[in-house]
Swiss-Prot record:
Annotated TM spans: none
Annotated disulfide bonds: none
Pfam families in the record: Ribosomal_L27
Species of the source: Streptococcus pneumoniae serotype 2 (strain D39 / NCTC 7466)
Name of the featured protein: Large ribosomal subunit protein bL27
Record-linked NCBIfam families: L27
């Protein structure tokens, strides 16, 4: 009789399996945004604003790179200004000597 009950014995896990999830990943921060402040003096070629798309438009003495980064074309003082009613632009004005 004892031999028969051992053959029918079933063992169950006392802890559930670990499982898996489809979450748990995140992308690296892209470090976008202003790199120079209003009123700050910058040299030519300095990055003023990193962006995706045109949140801020280039103004006087400011160029726009292939990835929409705004950069200074000349040495001068940075000014963030309004462009029309709903847009913004950044300009660089040369320092008078």
């Amino acid at each position: 009789m004892l031999k028969m009950t051992l053959n029918n014995l079933q063992l169950f896990a006392h802890k559930k399996g670990g499982g898996s999830t489809s979450n748990g990943r995140d992308s690296q921060a892209k470090r976008l945004g202003a790199k120079a402040a209003d009123g700050q003096t910058v040299t030519g070629g300095s990055i003023l604003y990193r962006q995706r798309g045109t949140h801020i438009y280039p103004g006087v003495n400011v160029g726009r790179g292939g990835d929409d980064t705004l950069f200074a074309k000349v040495e001068g003082v940075v000014r963030f200004e309004r462009k029309g009613r709903d847009k913004k632009q950044v300009s660089v004005y040369p320092i008078a000597k």
